[in-house]
Amino acid sequence: MALLLLEPATPVEWPVSFMLIALPLVAAFAHGPAAVGGATVFAVVLEGVLAGTPCCAGREVGYLWDRHYVASYICTGLVGVLGMILAAHRVRRERTLADVRFVADIAQRVLLRPVPHQIGSLHLESLYRSAAAEARIGGDLYEAVPTRYGVRLLIGDVRGKGLLAVETAAALLGAFREAAHDEPALPALADRVETSMDRRAVLLGGSEVGERFVTAVFAEIPLGEPLVRVVNCGHPPPVRIRSGEVCELDRGRSAPPLNLGVLLGEPYHVDAYSFRPGDQLLLYTDGITETRDAAGSFYPLLQRLRSWSSLPPRELLERLHQDLLAYSGDRLQDDIAALAVRLPAGEPPLPAAPPPG
């Protein structure tokens, strides 16, 4: 309608209908090749109507084939062809991206499947977010496995990015899920996982052998005992939340990261801490504590947890995620993962395993 009103007021050399040349390109941003082709035909027809109708052009009908209008038709057609090519390319990329996301979602469900919301009397929740906008999985990992020895937990962070980190995370999770049911002692579990990682690194060979190390925390909430055992392999220590008090479970006896222990020859140390009804345990990766605000200050995790001490695991991790996004201005610098475990008040510890036989 605006073109119909403006066309009579413009000189022949500069018809307003020339603006229709851009219509196919505009359509290419949101529609497929067929729709862009239809928009091109519509634009050329409308240009002809504006050029050949006296009431619109304010001139003789013969201007329908004036050289200026003919040039407009040709340009619109060429732009339409270009728009169809661009639209086809965009549609292919969107389909490829959708396929990649689909595969990534499947891989995430296999590698980082959600932990059970409840194991015995324990309530659990997990959080994972990749720093890459289109990524679903990366080098952070977590797992919770109910075993005859109790609930065994793992949180880890693989050095590096990309497929190398994903492959390493997959190998570590596979080793942990199997060994967690077999090894009676937590240090033996960590040692078996590291042995599996060492073997895999040797098989891969190359310069990656000494680079695939993983910081990790192995934790165990045993059956029939009000405590949590921790083996730390160069990872940020777990946090226990109790009646508004926040305490890092760290006695300064961290072992080297996985895949470096054999090189350094240091043993694994297991530390035990009380874990009573009402307590909550948070395991996390350093992507959380190393998140920075606009001024470059690190995220104050312990301070935040003190004000959220009464929240159950699901609400705690949701609040943590939203607060991290707000703190960083919606720009996470690193992958983040967290695992929250709570023993509700009034609930007894996990029941002891029945005697064999």
Predicted regions and their residues:
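Conserved subregion of the PPM/PP2C metallophosphatase catalytic domain
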Residues: M1-L6, V12, A34, A43-V44, ...
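Hydrophobic transmembrane alpha-helices
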Residues: M1-P11, L23-W65
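Canonical hydrophobic alpha-helical transmembrane segment
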Residues: I21-V26, T76-V79
